[in-house]
Design a protein with these regions (language model features):
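Transmembrane helical core of 7TM receptor-like proteins
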Residues: 1-317
């Protein structure tokens, strides 16, 4: 393409749901606002309760706190701008704002992939080596595992975002999405992006497949260990300790795979928007609900924390 067709953009326009009637957009605003608030409150509550209750000062809940923090971070990066767009029809986002949104969406997404694998390893050690669990999963080891889970997000987000935004863009600045994701922004580039696309595909496969294989390996060994337990009660107790995590992993990877690994012919921009909503907005809300309602220890901790707060308030009055 001739250099005269290149342009230096100062802002982008997020098309998101602009094709829908105003009434539908207002309805979506209310729905997404409720989901957003439930996500923030649910995950914040998990963080506070697991910090406040001594009974939850274990590796499993240390990892859960980090997962809740990542879910909050991903929502804060994407949802507020989407809500403002739906309510005020302000669809513009600055060049720097778009790059920042893309960077942190990559960072939190990649970190979550590896953290879910770390949580699977934690369940594997707890079920397959219960006597050695306190030694193997001490505070220092857990801190290292969390750091190792967060770290891949930095190079992936830095390389992919800086590389993409170093390309020249065409005259159009309309991003056909509700946030600055890589594929819709890449369509605006006026340059040969073959090398970048190869890097993006290989990077996405590695980021998704490496944690996925670690999770499958952990749960294969967990299943084998559970089948060796003689009593049905023992099997149920062992499975219940990892059922919440298994459900969260399934929701995350199914929605992520449907979004990024479907063929272009079967994955229209509108379908991709709906699928992106599932892993960026709906799944973080469901995660907090799953870990709150399906986990007896968290429910009991919530009850204890509530009664302590109520008793303290009564004493003050």
């Amino acid at each position: 393409m001739a250099a005269g067709n290149w342009t230096r953009l100062s802002e982008f326009i997020l098309m998101s749901f602009t094709s829908l009637p105003t009434e539908i957009q207002l309805l979506l605003f209310l729905v997404f606002l409720i989901i957003y608030l439930v996500t923030l409150m649910g995950n914040s509550l998990i963080i506070l309760v697991t910090l406040a209750d001594p009974m939850l000062h274990s590796p499993m809940y240390f990892f859960l706190r980090n997962l809740s923090f990542l879910e909050i971070g991903l929502n804060l990066v994407i949802v507020p701008k989407m809500l403002r767009t739906l309510l005020s029809q302000d669809t513009t986002i600055s060049f720097l704002g778009c790059a920042t949104q893309m960077y942190f969406s990559f960072f939190f997404g990649v970190a979550e992939c590896f953290l879910l694998a770390t949580m699977a390893y934690d369940r594997y050690v707890a079920i397959c080596s219960p006597l050695h669990y306190p030694v193997l999963m001490n505070q220092r080891t857990c801190t290292k595992l969390v750091a190792a889970s967060w770290f891949p997000g930095f190079p992936v987000a830095t390389v992919q975002t800086t590389w993409l935004f170093s390309f020249p863009f065409c005259a159009t600045n309309k991003v056909n999405h509700f946030f600055c994701d890589s594929p819709p922004v890449l369509r605006l580039v006026c340059a040969d992006t073959a090398r970048f696309e190869i890097y993006a595909i290989v990077g996405t496969i590695l980021v998704v497949m490496i944690p996925c294989l670690l999770i499958l390996s952990s749960y294969t060994r967990i299943a084998a260990a559970i089948l060796k337990i003689p009593s049905a009660k023992g099997k149920h107790k062992a499975f219940s300790t990892c059922s919440s995590h298994l459900l969260v992993v399934s929701l995350f990877y199914i929605s992520l795979s449907l979004t990024y690994f479907r063929s272009k012919s079967s994955n229209s921009p509108e379908n991709k928007k709906l699928l992106s909503l599932s892993y960026t907005i709906v799944t973080p809300m469901l995660n907090s609900i799953i870990y709150s309602l399906r986990n007896n220890e968290v429910k009991n901790a919530l009850s204890r924390t509530f009664h302590k707060a109520l008793a303290l308030r009564i004493c003050i009055l």
